[in-house]
Amino acid sequence: MSWHEQDYGFGTSSENSKINSDEFEDSMDVTEFNNPGEESTYPQANSWNDSNKTKDIAEYYDYSWSGQREANQQIPQPVPVQPRYPDEQNFSMNGETYPSEAYDYDYSGQEEAINAMNILQGNLERSNEYYSEGVPYSEEDLGAYAGGMTEDDQMYSNFNETGEFNLDIGSSKFSYLNAKNPYPAWIAENSIPITAENILEIFQELQAKFGFQYDSMLNMYDFFMVLLDSRSSRMDAENALKSLHADYIGGRNANYRKWYFSSSMDIDDSVGLQNCKFSSNGPKIKQAKKKQKRKSNKAETEGTNEPETSVQIDPLNVSMENWENEMKNLDCETQVRQLALYLLCWGEANNIRFCPECLCFIFKLANDFMQSEDYAKSEPIEDDCFYLDNVITPLYEFIRDQQFELLDGKLVRRERDHAQIIGYDDINQLFWYPEGIARIVTVDGTQLITLPKWERFHKLSEVDWKKAFYKTFYESRSWFHLVTNFNRIWVIHFTTYWYYTVFNSPTIIEKNFRQSVGPKPIPSCHWTSVSLGGAVATLLMLLATIFEWIHVPRKFPGSRPLLKRFLILILFFILNVAPTVFVFGFSTEEQQRTTGRLTVAIVHFIFSVFTFIYFSLVPLNNLFHRAYKSSSRTHLANRYFTADYARLQINDMCVSWGLWLLVFGAKFTESYFFLSLSFRDPILVLSTMKPYLCNITFLGSHLCIWQPKILLGIMYVTDLVLFFLDTYLWYILVNTVFSVARSFFLGISIWTPWRNIFARMPKRIYSKILCTPEVDSSYKPKVLVSQIWNSIIISLYREHLLAIEHVQRLIYHQVNSLDGDGSKTLKTPTFFVSQEDSSFNTEYFPAHSEAERRLSFFAQSLATPIPEPIPVDAMPTFTVLVPHYGEKILLSLKEIIREQDKLSRVTLLEYLKQLHANEWKCFVRDTKILAEEDALSNQDLNSQDESMKAEQLHKKFDDLPFYCIGFKNATPEYTLRTRIWASLRSQTLYRTVSGFMNYSRAIKLLYRVENPDVAQLFEGQMDVLEYELDRMASRKFKMCVSMQRYAKFTADEIENTEFILRAYPDLLIAYLDEDPPKEGETTPQLYAALIDGYSELDENKKRKPKYRIKLSGNPILGDGKSDNQNLSLPFYRGEYIQLIDANQDNYLEECLKIRSILAEFEAFDLKTNDPYAETNALYQNNPVAIMGAREYIFSENIGILGDVAAGKEQTFGTLFARTMAQIGGKLHYGHPDFLNAIYMTTRGGVSKAQKGLHVNEDIYAGMTALQRGGRIKHCEYYQCGKGRDLGFGSILNFTTKIGTGMGEQMVSREYYYLGTQLPFDRFLSFYYAHPGFHINNIFIMLSVQLFMVVLVNLGGMYHVVTVCDYDHDQKLTVPMRPEGCYQLNPVVNWLKRCIISIFIVFFISFVPLTVQELTERGAWRALTRLGKHFASFSPMFEVFACQTYAQSVIANLSFGGARYIGTGRGFATARLSFSLLFSRFAGPSIYLGSRTLLMLLFGTMTVWIPHLIYFWISTLAMCISPFIFNPHQFSWTDFFVDYREFIRWLSRGNSRSHINSWIGYCRLTRTRITGYKRRLLGVPVSKGVIDTSRAHFTNMFFTEIFIPLMLVPLTLVSYFFIDSQPGNPDPSKVTNPILRILILAFLPIIVAAVVSMTFAGMACMMGPLLDLCCKKFGAVLAALAHGITVFMFIIVFEVSWYLEAWCLAKTVLSMLCIIAIQRFFFKIIQVLFLTRELKHDGTNLAWWTGKWYSRGLGFHALSQPSRELICKMTELNFFAADFFLCHLLLFLMLPVLLIPFIDRWHSMMLFWLKPSKQIRPPIYSMRQNRLRKKIVQRYGTMFFLLLIAFLALIIIPLVVAKDLLANFEMDILRTYGLMQPRDTNWTENGTNWTTVNE
């Protein structure tokens, strides 16, 4: 068998052993050194009072103390560590050179990597050519101290002499290899099976033969060698190579191996796919159509015809066995060749890296060619872009052209939705099955599989890919996806609800119900009705199957056969319905009461329950078929790539099932008693209620008698929604309990019994941070621990988190021994015992400070089980990957000390000083010392008296400038320090880079501490020691920032980037480089480039890239972030990747745990295991793909909004992730997770990138890992810092992004595969942790709306009928009193329970955060934080956020438009205008809230219960939350200045264009439905306009037409009933509410149409003439038209009130009906009759000015006037509604505005700042103050006049209602029934009528 049956694999390892946290040597208590040489080796424990010794030690540790001396006390540093501030070095900014003392006064003096270093005998400069990760010396330099080196180092120094790396490749890029071996583990002494030189020759050969790019080859060679070095550092070299080959190619978990068999490549290699026919069970050999010809004439004459041999296909298990045998026999060179070829194919694949199986196919063809004789004969290809241009580019262009067209060198998006785009997944899935590969044909029609294997690779350039690819899944925007994907959720809830509700609805079944007897249904009828739940379940499964038919094309080989399932489901449906039909339809009442019919009903119920359980438990794709055999080829690709779920361990499985059994056990119990059983009485009274004597014109009593049934129907639906909400409620509670229990189990709660975390910290540092087995036992543990602890404390000090006094109390001191023999001993800080002893009153750090938090978490985390670390030199290499686009790199001085805009009241520096007061004090203190030192060194004071010196200095250095801006002398070195301080406390890239470069510091620290012999070896040679530490750190850790825009950075951005590169020269920066277009071309040539701090500068002062790899085109085809990550993937190094965002932080103490974190991947136990050995079980387990980690949101406690955002991240990222990871429900959410790099990059990368569909790119990597067999774990003992949005708008932007992204996920194929294939418990975990959250939000808001509809319909009855007396304890069989009454009190009680349910669902969102705080920080902190949230109106924000989540998902499924929203990184201190907030949030929430508020007002006026107060708060929150959380919203002057801006916003934009105007907002809102006009072919999209396509009618139908339509009858029936005068025996008093409401609803529309046409005619006739003298003619005309509609709004309200006989409740209901009718009418017009919007507002301007001729309309001039008339008709009505709504919102805020000092209290609520630390008011000039006072006077008067007018419209009619009604009665109104009589309750006096059958 050929090697082609090999593929990529991934191996796993056995469980890592955990360290007993309390294991520690008794010698920790020893206070003396007993080892010779310790004192010189670790001289860190000097006395703090010995200044001379301190100086020596500072020099020893290469530590700069300039600016740090205070009272002759300095801090000893055990190990030199890189500071977060730049090193002591000279560097250039703004063309000036700054000395290191300017800013690095207190930081380590590690030499800049590219500057000279002193090594023993003098200055040795780094080589001009060097290796990227810091091999800085030439061999001659190293030879100077070879005598003091180890054997390995001596071998390196003679590297050229051995010839091992004596490479002649014609490039200076390899000169760094001559300096020193950058891969120390891959050396001859380690018995390597193949030398690095030979490996390079293989890479060069493949590059020449296949036409790979030279730089790409160099990059991939280094990539491969780093992998080999990483693996071989912890296992023998041969197994290191084999394990890599197993991970990539041939192992059991290798993706290539799985693809190889799923696509039947083994059959292609043996018999050829061209000889097979395809079926769902795999390829079959074709039957020969004719006999084979004789072989030759010679054979015929000799009679030696050979017998025909039958060709057969080996079974799958046989093929796999052959594969494994082949893998075992591969020699090392072949393994290297295969790995090299794959990596070279992958490295240049560009966007095709998102298609892993496509890459497998390309690699297979390339390998077939490599294995052939033609390969050996082939000549090198001169074009080094041959592979890119002929293989990758055609595929790239197909992908690009699906979404974009290229116009003038720019990509312009096509108007296609996902269902019409053949995306990455569709392309990739073509290669899953042999049927797909068989579709690949060349341009001449030849099938690729018919060609010889070795010719196929070179034929790829001739393939017609358009004929090959097709949609394999339709991601259409439809709610039908939810039916299919989550069918089991619907089955569980709908069926159970049916059982519960029908069982408690006996009156629905009983024919002859009598109230005095009560419900007595026939048992057989009752049970068979309940049993119809099985039919409900079957019907849901039928719908799911039908919709699957729609979404999955039948021609896709991976589609499941649905006809068989459909027919069996129909049979199930018949079996579940037939007994009911038999009992009800074919049985008399006497027969129904027989035992036989009851038996049928019971059997029916049993079968129904069986159906329900079966459909609930079994995934949709597994229905009605047996499990596949392991040897079966049936749907092998689906099993490998979509359903290869890792099995849970037995304990985790028990936890998973236990959690869901508890959830549903509690849910079913509570739902039955609280929801269903309590619903029994309302069902009974409403289902039997018969209204009497109710009539209206046209309909008589035909409608009103059905009012109770209609109300009951709405209540059924509402109860069903609440039934769904209960499940999520119990999920939150039970999940929280399980998470807390696990936190106790892991020991991470402060309530755990072993609370002495600080006392045991030294022991745990020794046992869990240090790799103690590798440490020489002669070294005392205390010595080692002191170095770690002192380094942590010093890092806190350098970051200005601790004052020098705190440091003195916290670190280990070296003191004289008590024995008096002159020896030294270490004094342990009292901190470790003081935390457990209340008698200590010493302050070790500021209370509730960042230092306290970090040290507490570090101590707490060490109490948890942590994998045992391995030696530093054996740890795997890993990379931190940071995507960067436009985030701030380093704050400029202007950004820090000046307000960002005119709306901001505070500078960033002032705000940061208030947030970090103690840290600012430490910073100022250090700055002053630095300034004093500079002053002393710059002036001659020898002739002055000492006292005069001190006095002069004191006068000179006044404290005020330092405390204000951080410096007094505005020289660059001082301003830079302030910039750095602010940047390290903001969300900047500098903070991220400096934080995560702590990994380098941690590795050097651990390596030195654990290897004291290294320090002894280089004793007195600190430069050499530092070099050795740098070499180890750069070998094990890389950090790569993917700066997509680097080549187009501004000068400031370039300067800031250079600053970071000089501070951290090992930092890698990948970016998108560009060459101008060649002659005759319009498209620039793009490259992926890499630089670091060692890259040379060209003549333009730009860094020369180390690698520059040509791309097929613009790689940014998606939403940006995922493409940016993919761009940098070839430049990562090592075995693992940590994905980080550019607003995160990390800390030294957390970085010390890196070895334990990497050990969680269970890949450290591979030392002697051959991955291809039969006995190796490590590679048979599912590999760990993703390792999740905690996040600390450092924006918490700085205001309510930042704290809410932080709390959500904490609960989701920690509390729930803890449980979800254990039960297999956790996915990947981006930061700060660690990824198994080989596993993920061979399966599509670290994210997905189709534009729009994958807007939440990170989570798809998690779903891919879950589907393909990877395990996802969670780490409790490690956390990173994370920034979060702080403003209302930015938080809601993030919410919108997540919501729209979830809408995209719901239509994706990943959700389809997971929803229809996951096992039951795993499915529930996935659903409720991800889509369930958003669906629950939709259900919450739906329940509120349904509740309001119930309230409106109940209020319509409650207002005009007599309600019966009701005693909750007595039965409903008691006669109702008074006579003729309506028994509505059970319905009111049901309302109360509904409100309680909805309240609990909202309140439950606070439980996880409270519990999280309670377990990790204690009861007081939990209560304090919760109290702050409630005092700051956090519940109102939660309501608004819930609505935003729900609206985002709904809008995305209706209109699409999901895009990456860059969330805010700054501090929200600026006041936003009312108009801006209204236009942003009106559509998502304010309009809905106002309609809900009107419903609630009617309900309150008719059915008052105290429970409604909660709904008043909630609905008000939906309307006014944006303004409540707007900084300084209630500042008196700003309020009226803003009101002026609001009036202007309403009025402008009608005579000339204005971006910020009401008409612009209205047009933008409308384009969501209509879209913009299609651009002409070849014409680019207009600037400033987002190209929005028209939404599809079917997508919009549900939300834009169906729901508004349903609200019309649901409100009208209540209105008709309230005006039907129930109980009135006089038929002559019947009114006509139908005609009345139609007139009132359409009168404003007609008036608006007439006004629009009239004014448009006036504009056409007079506009061009008057415009010569009256420039604002159009604006005046528009203002008159809008004013008329506002007046009409008032008329409609007052007339409606008059016609309702001045009954305010009925008037409110009539306004509800008018709004519902108009809303539906306008929706119909917009959806059906409005064409697309023009991309300019020319038609609007032409309408009011009459200038149609100059608008550039072209042929549109014929159709636009009629279209604009429709628009104006809707706009005028919308304007009137917005005018009144906005003023009502402003009037609601007025009482708050009048509260004294409200701005101060409001700021305290938002920012949690004490009154003494409030943000100062802005400073205005005298002219500005005068202007603002005039504005307040003018517009304040206008505001209050309008308020008086509004109040008058309400108060006057109320006062004079009786007189008005008596004096203004009109007979014509009575004649047509338009006038409603005064309210009279005709049922209250008792009649002979009754509402029930007694």
Curated annotation (Swiss-Prot):
The chain crosses the membrane at residues 530-550, 566-586, 600-620, 655-675, 710-730, 731-751, 1338-1358, 1394-1414, 1476-1498, 1503-1525, 1598-1618, 1637-1657, 1673-1693, 1697-1717, 1778-1798, 1837-1857. Residues 32-51 have a biased composition (Polar residues). One of its GO terms (cellular component) is prospore membrane. Induction: By sporulation. The keyword RNA-binding does not apply. It is found in: Prospore membrane. Its EC number is 2.4.1.34. Residues 286-296 have a biased composition (Basic residues). Pfam families: FKS1_dom1 (PF14288), FKS1_dom2 (PF23605), Glucan_synthase (PF02364). It catalyses: [(1->3)-beta-D-glucosyl](n) + UDP-alpha-D-glucose = [(1->3)-beta-D-glucosyl](n+1) + UDP + H(+). Its main location: membrane. Alternate catalytic subunit of the 1,3-beta-glucan synthase (GS) complex. Synthesizes 1,3-beta-glucan, a major structural component of the yeast cell wall. Has a role in ascospore development where it is required for the assembly of a functional spore wall. PANTHER family: 1,3-BETA-GLUCAN SYNTHASE COMPONENT FKS1-RELATED, LYST-INTERACTING PROTEIN LIP5 DOPAMINE RESPONSIVE PROTEIN DRG-1. Belongs to the glycosyltransferase 48 family. This is 1,3-beta-glucan synthase component bgs2. It comes from Schizosaccharomyces pombe (strain 972 / ATCC 24843) (Fission yeast).
